[in-house]
UniProtKB/Swiss-Prot annotation:
Probable component of the nuclear pore complex (NPC). Residues 22-84, 218-237 are annotated as: Disordered. Required for the export of mRNAs containing poly(A) tails from the nucleus into the cytoplasm. It comes from the Eukaryota. It is found in: Nucleus, Nuclear pore complex; Nucleus membrane. Its main location: nucleus. FG repeats lie at residues 231-232, 274-275, 284-285, 305-306, 314-315, 335-336, 347-348. This is Nucleoporin NUP42. GO terms for molecular function: zinc ion binding. A zinc finger (C3H1-type) spans 1-25. InterPro entries: Nucleoporin_NUP42 (IPR051767), Znf_CCCH (IPR000571).
Amino acid sequence: MAICSFFLQGRCRYGEKCWNEHPRGGSSRYQSQNRYQEPPGNAKGTWGSSSQRYVQPSSFSRSTTWVNRDNEKPSSGSHSGFDNRNVKFTAATGFPSSQNRFAALSSQDNSRDAQTDKGNIIDDITNDMEIWESSGQWMFSVYSMLREKKNISGFADFSPEELRLEYYACQAEGNPLKYINAVQQLGSKWKQRILELKNLNPSSKMALFNELSSPSSDMTSGYNGQQKPAFGSSSFPTNNTAPTAATFSFKADAANAAKAGATNSLAGSNVPAFGNKPTSAPSFGSGGAATAASFSFAPSSSSNFGATTSTSGFGNASNTASFQGTANSAAAPAFGVASSSTAATGFGGGFSTTGAMNTGVRDLFSAGTVGPGPVTSLFVQTTGPLHATASSTSLDGQSFRPSALNTTNSLFTPQNELSAEELAQFKAQRFTLGKIPLKPPPADLLNVS
């Protein structure tokens, strides 16, 4: 370990915490002690006693506040030369002897931490511009000196994906030179801004300081703010107006409806997709204003064939308020087939197969074709027979009689339609894994407790 030269001179301020060696033996120690020890004669004249001896303390033995207590004590004209050196040192620094000699350095550090020097800001910005220009980094990006500061103006922020998208848009337009000119223009603006920041004059420095000190006001929200297009004009037909609850709707606009050539209808009339208020009778047999009770899947009162028949939401006649009543006129139930003269039940019951129909009646989901003339179904176009027997057309185009409705969509399967393996599985107490039948069980094998 090296010997501390300041300790040999008697002015090491670290004391025992010094990282160099302080020798403690031989003549060095004697000289060190003798240096801080006043002559007995001077002490006698000063303190009035020959037994008293004033020893000048070393610099590292002072208090942490570096207050010179020597000025509080009486001193003689023949005092030690060390104190004269101390006074001479403090006078050269320009601070009183009671002040810390290192206070100037600490105050400068605190002031630099409290407020950033403007000269350092200019040096940092100039250095960053030189590095940015020579490093070959991405040009089309913003720059900010500090995280708390706003971005310096004059730089464009475009990602490679945005440039690629703009190139594809210009290529689709058949004008790739537009993309090339735009990129070259952005590159020239970037180089010009770099050159301006590297060579700042006093007026531009003042403008830059004002820009950095002003609060940021050009920041917009990522979801609600309007984003500027990359090259002055957006390639996509966007609407800058944010949608509100009043404008949000699934309803098609008038332009799309005009292009379609017809209104949205289920039964061929002017009925919306999910029903509308009937003109002659409401859905549940009560009049009044349009309420939740008027919501219906039924078509309006005017049918496809010009007949003035009134419909009801659940198959009852429109002249009564019940869900099952006698119909004075031909009523079309919502989910059943057409009936001639009997009452229509809730879901299409009470069929008559022998009545002659004067007008064609059409329900919502299945086309009941009765009477002369062609009848258009919702899904299948069929031609009705010219005889007086009512028939119905299913969704798959197969004609069947109303009396045979429960033969195909039955809840139970007859035993003669099951295979021996399926019948054995139904008769067993538990199904075998991998052999469970997919058909409904027979009614006579069900054991309801």
